[in-house]
Amino acid sequence: MRFGIADAVMRPLPSPPSMPTRFFNTYSRQLEEFRPLDPAGKCVKLYTCGPTVYNFAHIGNFRAYVFEDLLQRHLEARGFEVERVMNLTDVDDKTIRGCRQLGVRLADFTQKFKDAFFDDLGTLRVKRATHFPAATEPRFIARMIEMIAVLLEKEIAYQAEDQSLYFRLSKFPEYGKLAHLNLDELRPSGRVQSDEYEKENIGDFALWKAWDEADGDVKWDSPWGPGRPGWHIECSAMATALLGPEIDIHCGGVDNIFPHHEAEIAQSESVTGKKFVRYWMHCAHLMVEGQKMAKSAGNFYTLRDLIEKGWTGREIRYALITVNYRLPLNFTFDGLRAAQSALGS
């Protein structure tokens, strides 16, 4: 008996119990069978790193968000109930610089880009997360201060002469395991360098940044004086406040692995004493026409730029999922045209 493609499509798939869900875990660099923390094996706690709302999100960002959307849909199709958190970073150097340049309040500056982000998610048909916490919400600022206080009490954190607080990497020997780096070989670069005030060791990262004039009116009171949270503690606080000390899956782009996700592990596990995340999943970089996306190269696109050029959300979404999430994606206009043809639009 011969079978055609239509017959193969119509044949029932094996029942879920015979097909265990497996994910590639960045931490172990291996495919692992997925077993949720929930004793009933039903509920999944998923944390995904969201945007820094200082500008419109670009297509590189949305590659990760569409991947995370597919992950959630896959889990739900497998019968899991997903509680997903996607954070909004609404206070950092970029957001402060942006609001000060325009002479507006930080909250007013970031709200424009929060609203735009939610509109863009709708354009790409990305499911809404269960929670979209913003770093500046009072309950999360309180959680950050609480966590830092615990780290100070354990002497894992310290206050420098400039009144900023730092995490002592020497107190967390597991640091670097996610990125598979040797702690002794780490050298500061990029966002790590921006955390340098007056530290005991060059690798120590900021937990709380003491206020200075460049921050304008962006500051919160704390037991250590006015200031603002470091980037890393924001996610640790929001994740543990909403999902508890242990999370099933944590996602993000590969650029988040170091130092951000390494720092999250160090902070969270030092406070709670529990394994922070069981499965780490990271989306690879997106290039445009074979080159790194950059405004200086003229190949930097927000989702809105592409919509203005006449492409639809469906076509862009299709183009973003044509390559395995762990492989770099070369985003091209030929690829968009292929997506358009495949969708019959």
Question: How does the language model describe each region?
Answer:
Residues G4, M10-Y54, D69, A142-G344:
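Alpha-helical recognition segments enriched in aromatics with Gly/Pro capping
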Residues G122-A134, K154-S164:
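Short secondary-structure capping/junction motifs at helix and strand boundaries
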